[in-house]
């Protein structure tokens, strides 16, 4: 591969998803305050702006020639955006709100190299079971909810609360593989060449 590949993310899940391929990359945490971007009502534009800002921050950290991958993921329910919870109580409230209903998980990817910038979004529908109220705090403490958009995860036992998923499961983990590969192919890279 000609270009150095940089995953601009502090997410362990995104890193783990990309590590499932043999593609060489480094992981750089973008020093960017996501709270500086105000949600204006369009989750696709919101996640695109966040991912674009992350990519620019990584580029400014000495990776100007690298192929930079950044992403931002949000949960959307009845027009409201759920990011990472700010406290255990906030996570419990998020899960209580989402319990027994369906919501969208939207991730926008931005790939940036020099002046070439591409982006694409993925939308996955997730339905929750009616989560027993007495298990909400246990769930939050068991699955590092404060590090997860919407306060939940799909991997390991975290999927216990999920009734149905329509769309890309990797999107819920923050790195939709099919969409990522489509963008990488525009830079003459295919994940098919890096299967383990």
Curated annotation (Swiss-Prot):
Q: Which Pfam families match?
A: Maf
Which Gene Ontology terms describe the biological processes this protein takes part in? Answer: nucleotide metabolic process
Q: What species does this protein belong to? A: Chlamydia trachomatis serovar D (strain ATCC VR-885 / DSM 19411 / UW-3/Cx)
Entry EC no(s):
3.6.1.9
Q: Which reaction does it catalyse?
A: dTTP + H2O = dTMP + diphosphate + H(+); UTP + H2O = UMP + diphosphate + H(+)
Source domain of life: Bacteria
| HAMAP family per the UniProt record, alphabetical | Maf
The entry's protein name is dTTP/UTP pyrophosphatase
Question: Which cofactors are reported in the record for this sequence?
Answer: a divalent metal cation
GO cellular component, alphabetical, reads: cytoplasm
